[in-house]
Design a protein with these regions (language model features):
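Structural recognition of an alpha-helix C-terminal capping motif at a helix-to-coil junction
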Residues: 39-46, 50, 59-71
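DNA-recognition helix of helix-turn-helix
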Residues: 70, 140-170
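Amphipathic alpha-helical segment used for protein-protein interaction
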Residues: 98-130, 135-140, 144
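A short, charge-rich alpha-helical start-of-domain segment used by transcription regulators
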Residues: 2-25, 35-38
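C-terminal edge and immediately downstream basic/flexible tail or linker adjoining helix-turn-helix-like DNA-binding
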Residues: 2-6, 10-12, 85-87, 91-94, ...
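C-terminal flanking helix
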Residues: 20, 24, 45, 123, ...
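Arg/Lys-rich amphipathic alpha helix in sigma70-family domain 2
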Residues: 56, 67-88, 104-108
Length: 173
């Protein structure tokens, strides 16, 4: 006997296990406040659960998960926009030192925090693109998720990297 609910639950558990870390990083990049971040992550998981019943395999599961997560996060940003905060036009960090001693770990943590702050200042579409890029999605996959052309995505990635690197160095990071 076929049980769609069990299949959906099994699929959700698999997706949650495989992409949970990426979803947490995405939520962290969108929300600074830990309570708001937890709410966003929960909202993403609920949306994923609901959406899996409609998943038809026309795209990869990875693309589906990122599309759902980014749509939820972007919608939330738009809804939560209360002030006319100026978003940075574009911005990337080329490398983060990978040291093992305690002081180096603290420096790395501070560097990552600063990178997340810079990413958070980006316009939602630019933030979405760079986060997908940092999750190692290729240009065609990012284009499919965002609805932009692959060429436009490639151009934006290049500009975002330049902007982030410039801001990172200009602000003494």
């Amino acid at each position: 006997m076929h049980h769609p609910g069990r299949d959906q639950e099994r699929l959700y558990l698999q997706v949650s296990d495989e992409f949970g870390g990426a979803l947490e990083r995405l939520a962290r990049a969108y929300e600074r406040d830990s309570d708001v971040r937890r709410d966003l992550l929960q909202e993403i998981h609920v949306a994923l659960w609901r959406s899996l019943a409609r998943f038809d395999g026309r795209c990869s599961m990875r693309t589906w998960v990122y599309r759902v997560a980014h749509n939820i996060a972007t919608s939330r940003v738009i809804r939560a926009k209360k002030s006319a905060t100026a978003f940075a036009e574009l911005a990337l960090l080329e490398s983060i030192p990978d040291k093992t001693d305690g002081e180096a770990q603290l420096d790395r943590r501070r560097t990552l925090d600063r990178v997340y702050e810079l990413i958070h200042e980006l316009r939602p579409i630019d933030r979405q693109i760079i986060l997908l890029y940092l999750e190692d999605l290729d240009t065609p996959a990012i284009a499919e998720i965002t609805g932009l052309t692959a060429r436009n995505v490639a151009t934006k990635i290049h500009r975002i990297k330049q902007l982030l690197a410039r801001q990172f160095h200009d602000k003494g990071c």
